[in-house]
Structures are given as C-alpha cells and as structure tokens.
C-alpha cells in the first residue's frame, strides 16, 4: 500500500545495484497506481493539476524540500496549473525502491 511506502525512508543508492526489471516495476506500480511506467521501464511519471500557477509552484517547492530531505531528486516540469514529476535513479539509469517511495511521498503532497 502507498501508506507503507510513504513511511519508508530512501536509502543511498551506490550505483552497484541493478535497476528493477520492467516486470518488477509493474508489480511496484500496484502500490502507486496513479503513476505511469515509461515504455522502456526506466522511470515513472505522473502529472498533477492545480487551480493556478501559485499552487503549482507551491507543490514544486514542497517536493523540492522533500527531495532534499530524502536525498533523492525528481525531474520536474511545471507551468500554470500543472506539474509533471518523473522519478528515476540516475546512478543506475533505471528504477530502484527509492523511486516508488518518493512517488508515494509525492502523492501525499498532491492536492485532493
């Protein structure tokens, strides 16, 4: 469940672990169903909508603070009323448990 993932803390990825297989990533997506797996299975992405630019910017700022705290950082694009977040562990050029932990934590920041 996403609550279990939200309660976890990211562990530093040293880069000496293999990325998740596409099948493993699909299983993890069951815990973060709002996220989409890329065609190559190397990242997950979700788009968010907001009432205006200020709300989108506030979400991005909160996500930035969370990323700094956890030591794991997303790619973020945003504009008036929207944001798109992509998680991938760059050291392994693919997905790691940390990406799903952070996806769940990102969901916790999203407007309801």
Swiss-Prot record:
Domain of life: Bacteria
Keyword Lyase: yes
SUPFAM superfamilies for this protein: PCD-like
Region (Disordered): 1-30
Single Gene Ontology BP annotation: tetrahydrobiopterin biosynthetic process
Sequence similarity: Belongs to the pterin-4-alpha-carbinolamine dehydratase family.
Protein name as annotated: Putative pterin-4-alpha-carbinolamine dehydratase
